Design a protein with these regions (language model features):
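Outer-membrane beta-barrel translocator domains and adjoining extracellular loop/strand segments
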Residues: 57-63, 100-107, 152-159, 195-202, ...
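Exposed, low-structure sequence patches enriched in small/polar residues
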Residues: 3, 49-53, 71, 128, ...
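Transmembrane beta-strands of outer-membrane beta-barrel pores
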Residues: 50-56, 92-98, 135-137, 144-149, ...
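Short loop/turn motifs that connect adjacent beta-strands in outer-membrane beta-barrel proteins
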Residues: 21-22, 28-44, 80-88, 137, ...
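Surface-exposed coil loops of outer-membrane beta-barrel proteins
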Residues: 139-210
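Cleavable N-terminal export/targeting peptides
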Residues: 1-33
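Short, glycine/acidic-rich beta->alpha junctions
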Residues: 70, 121-123, 166, 201, ...
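Beta-barrel outer-membrane channel/assembly domains of diderm bacteria
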Residues: 20-121, 127-133
Length: 295
């Protein structure tokens, strides 16, 4: 009986972990990936990234409210590669929800608060521009970033569902890929302010990197060391608010161990663990200044 209970517990634990991983993997597959090599030189392409979605979140309790996200995101854009190391993209990004034709006319950081007055009709529209330069193992991106689930952030640091609610990340990004090291560093400028503005400047700085400590050879074992960091800043010197500077830091370091087999049923197993830390460098958004956790 004890063995049966342990087996059931193990299956349930694996199911919960697999459900979380499946959601992350799903949003990662839905996110456009960086692949300059697939673009022919001096050829003009018309691409349309289209995503239709219906996501229902039902919660029981007082911690979070339930909500439903029915809609679509469209990004039609032209792509041109004038040189082997350079590609340019220009287009439009549109976010639409079923059941409404009015969208608040300001930056979307999550499910936005309706303020009335200033709004767009039909869809939440934004210009789309991306310049990508590839120099050896490094790739530099200016404009619309390869963002959201593309960064590979773990769930405690980033909610993949943001792909359905937030504006595309815009700013500057550096991607590095070597034989044993992968890095993604970026700054996402979320809110620009004018002189005497009524809201704060907002941007997020992030970094993910992974070092391959053990490569899967004949033994099938792979070991990686992932390090991740997110810094969110709210402030500015031109705004007309009394909120002060707000700076929140979250980071993690972990280990990922993977074993592969040549088997029809069980061909891979993976376990990972991360140590997380939080630090409120400035402001009073959190009721505490530091924190730590395991995931």
């Amino acid at each position: 009986m004890r063995r049966a209970l342990l087996l059931v517990f193990g299956i349930l634990l694996a199911a919960v972990a697999d459900a979380q991983t499946s959601e992350v993997d799903l949003f990662r597959q839905l996110t456009p990936q960086h692949d300059m090599d697939s673009i022919e030189m001096k050829t003009l392409y018309l691409d349309v990234d289209a995503l239709a979605f219906f996501k229902d979140n039902e919660f029981d309790g007082n911690i979070a409210k339930g909500y439903t996200l029915p809609g679509a995101r469209l990004t039609p854009h032209l792509t041109y590669r004038p040189r082997p190391e350079l590609s340019l993209e220009l287009g439009l990004s549109a976010l639409m929800y079923h059941g409404t034709n009015r969208y608040p006319n300001y930056a979307f950081h999550d499910i936005v608060t309706w303020k009335g007055g200033a709004y767009q009709g039909g869809a939440h529209l934004l210009p789309y521009f991306r310049a990508t330069a590839q120099l050896g193992a490094a790739t530099f991106v200016l404009g619309d970033l390869y963002g959201t689930a593309h960064h590979g952030l773990i769930l405690p640091l980033y909610k993949p569902e943001n792909l359905l609610t937030t504006d595309p990340e815009k700013g500057f990004q550096t991607l590095i890929r070597t034989r044993r090291w992968k890095m993604d560093a970026w700054i996402d400028w979320q809110s620009f302010i004018y002189e005497m503005d009524k809201h704060q400047e907002a941007f997020t700085v992030g970094m993910t990197q992974s070092v391959e400590l053990l490569r899967p050879k004949a033994h099938g074992w792979a070991l990686e060391l992932p390090v991740q960091l997110m810094v969110q800043h709210r402030g500015g010197e031109q705004d007309d608010t009394d909120l002060g500077v707000q700076t929140l830091c979250n980071g993690s370091i972990g280990l990922q161990l993977r074993k592969t087999w040549n088997h029809r049923v069980l061909n891979a197993a993976e376990v990972e663990m991360h140590t997380l830390g939080a630090y409120q460098q400035a402001g009073k958004l959190w009721p505490f200044n530091t924190g730590a956790a395991l995931w």
